[in-house]
Amino acid sequence: PGGKTFHAADRLHGTGKVLSRDLTEYKTDLIEENKDRMCYENVEVQQWDALVEDESLLESVDVLLADLPCSGLGIMGRKNDIKYQMTQQQLSELAQLQRDILSVIWKYVKPGGEMIFSTCTLNRGENIENIRWIEENTPMRLVSIEDYLPETLKAEQEVRDIYS
């Protein structure tokens, strides 16, 4: 745990601060251990329920990485049993949980800041429908990352059309 946290900290080259939060003490302890082992001084780790608004963060974050709980259907190659355990109701509940969290955390982004919405799933409800929800329920707007991707990761137009 903490891979995205430490990547963000590396990208800051010792400047700024990365706040990494998780609901569970188990994960925050693991992230804290990795932080100490790798000597990251610009990372702070907190156990926090993302459904609870933190007034001290309102409009204060330059970049928010919303790495939310998801079904994991995009990593079935590593966790093959996921497809047999996930029901349609559970998928809907996860998408709703994501929207509930998003309704709280988008407010942390300062004007002109960015929120990166990240999932490891291919589920339309957790991805496309939640992106549409963000656009309909917050002042945030979708920005294409196409220009930032290496050529090998750029999808052909017909593939992009499937997901839009």
Per-range role (PLM):
Residues 1-164:
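S-adenosylmethionine
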